[in-house]
Regions:
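Conserved small/polar residues in nucleotide/adenosyl-binding loops
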Residues: 152-155
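Short amphipathic alpha-helical/adjacent loop interface patches that line ligand
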Residues: 146
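Catalytic cores of RNA-modifying enzymes
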Residues: 1-140
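Active-site-proximal catalytic alpha-helix in oxidoreductases
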Residues: 143
C-alpha cells in the first residue's frame, strides 16, 4: 500500500487508539474511510465506538459475521431488526457489499461472513439531546421485546 499516498495502514488496537487524533494528524481532520477485517467477537463494540467517538468517518467497510451484517441492515418489522439495526442506521446507511462463504478461509469457519459498507450520514436522521439515553432506551426496548417496559428498565 506504500504506493498510495492517501492510504495508511495502522497496526493498532482500534479500541485503544485515538482515531480522532490520528485523523487530525494524518488527514487534517477531513473525513476518513476505514476498511477492516474485524474480530467477530468484538464487532459491535468496535463499530459503535467508531460512531460514538465522532471520528470524522466518511465510511466504514468491514468484514463481519454474516448474521451481524444482516442485523445491521435489517428493516423495521423483520426478525433481524433490533438494537444493532437501529443504532447503526442512526449513524449510517448500511449496504451489504459481498457475501464471503466459509470455504474462502483456511481453516474453514463454521459461520458465513459478509462485507458491509456503512456510509456515515452528514447529519443523523433525527436530532436528540442525549444520545446515551437514546441508546439505553433502544437496548432496553429490544432486550424486553415480549415484556412491558417500566421506568427502571431505561433509567
Amino acid at each position: 500500500m506504500s504506493a498510495y499516498d492517501n492510504v495508511s495502514v495502522i497496526n493498532e488496537d482500534v479500541l485503544k487508539v485515538d482515531l480522532r487524533k490520528l485523523a487530525q494528524e494524518r488527514n487534517g481532520g477531513k473525513p476518513i474511510k476505514v476498511v477492516a477485517n474485524l474480530p467477530y467477537y468484538i464487532t459491535t463494540p468496535i463499530i459503535m465506538s467508531l460512531f460514538e467517538s465522532h471520528v470524522p468517518l466518511k465510511s466504514l467497510t468491514v468484514m463481519v459475521q454474516k448474521e451481524v451484517a444482516l442485523r445491521m441492515q435489517a428493516g423495521p418489522g423483520t426478525k433481524d431488526y433490533g438494537a444493532l439495526s437501529l443504532a447503526v442506521q442512526y449513524y449510517a446507511s448500511p449496504y451489504l457489499a459481498a457475501n464471503v462463504p466459509p470455504n474462502c478461509f483456511m481453516p474453514r469457519p463454521n459461520v458465513g461472513s459478509a462485507v458491509i459498507r456503512l456510509t456515515r450520514f452528514e447529519e443523523t436522521p433525527v436530532q436528540v439531546k442525549d444520545e446515551k439515553l437514546l441508546f439505553r432506551l433502544i437496548r432496553a426496548s429490544f432486550n424486553q421485546r415480549r415484556k412491558t417496559l417500566d421506568r427502571k428498565s431505561v433509567v
